[in-house]
Structures are given as C-alpha cells and as structure tokens.
A protein has these predicted regions:
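Short glycine/serine/proline-enriched coil/turn segments at secondary-structure junctions
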Residues: 57-60, 76, 124, 141
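Beta-strand-rich domains and repeat architectures in extracellular enzymes and scaffolds
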Residues: 31-71, 78-110
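Asp-box/WD-like beta-propeller blade repeats and closely related beta-sheet repeat scaffolds
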Residues: 120-154
Length: 154
C-alpha cells in the first residue's frame, strides 16, 4: 500500500512538472503597452520616466511631487533623479497617465480629489505643473478620489 501511495505521489509530481513546462511559456514577448489605443506608438529609447510620488511627513518638503528620472543609457545622468515638481501639499498621490499625444501627464489623487496636469512635452527633463483641477468631486456629482486617468481620443 505504501509503494502504491509513493508511486501515486511521484506520478503526480512528474505530471505537475510536465504540465508546468508545457503550459508556462519560457519566453515572453510584448509590444509597447499604452494607456490608450489611440496613443502614438513609442519608437526608440525613452529619455525619462516620470514617477508620481506621495509626500511623507519628515521627508523632504513633505509634498506630493512628480519626480523625473533619466532612463536613456546614453545619458550621463542615466538612472539618476534629475528633477522634481512639488504640488504643494499631501493629496495621496495615486495613478497617472499620459494624454494620447503624450504632451501632458494627468496625475490623480485619492484624499483631496485633485487632478494635477503636468506639461511633459515643452521641456521633458523639467515638467511644469500646467493646471490643477480642484473641483472634480463637485463637478462629477460626488465622486471622491479618482483612481486612474485615461486618455480618450479628441
């Protein structure tokens, strides 16, 4: 009986391993992932990545901010923070997304319901705060804490 149970266990383990090898791809290929199907395809190396960050008490200026990092390996600043744009306060920074032309980055917040719009096109290394939507909760009929922004055509 013990041998039969052992054989059953070994068989189960072998079948699990076989199925894992057959069903799980060993190479994964992907194309550019975009926020919107209407967004222009990114061609070539990105120069910067924008990180929408939370302000924290006792750290820096304690404000939410958009941080710019150089990501082009050819840049002498590769892998370094090259700038940041504070938004004046802590709003529980959350998700962000590009407009379909990638000229603006919309950054949502949870606590205040504000939406910050950054111009990342005029000078990509030094984004500027373009506009702040402060009445989203009222204008949307009471929706609080927009989670994700999404670019639609037009």
């Amino acid at each position: 009986m013990k041998i039969r149970k052992l054989m059953s266990t070994v068989y189960g383990m072998l079948m699990s391993s076989f199925l894992a090898l057959v069903l799980v791809p060993t190479h994964v290929f992907s194309d550019e992932t975009c926020m919107s199907p209407y967004m222009a395809k990114i061609v070539g190396q990105e120069d910067y990545v924008y990180v929408w960050t939370l302000g924290q008490v006792g750290t820096g200026d304690e404000q939410d901010k958009l941080v710019t990092i150089a990501v082009n390996p050819a840049s002498p600043h590769y892998g370094n923070v090259i700038g940041h744009t504070s938004v004046g306060g802590r709003n529980e920074a959350h998700h962000s997304g590009f407009t379909d032309d990638r000229h603006y980055l919309w950054a949502a917040t949870l606590d205040t319901g504000k939406i910050f719009i950054f111009d990342v096109h005029t000078n990509p290394a030094k984004p500027k705060l373009h506009k702040v939507i402060t009445d989203f909760t009222k204008a949307s009929g009471g929706i609080v804490g927009p989670h994700t922004t999404y670019a639609l055509p037009g």
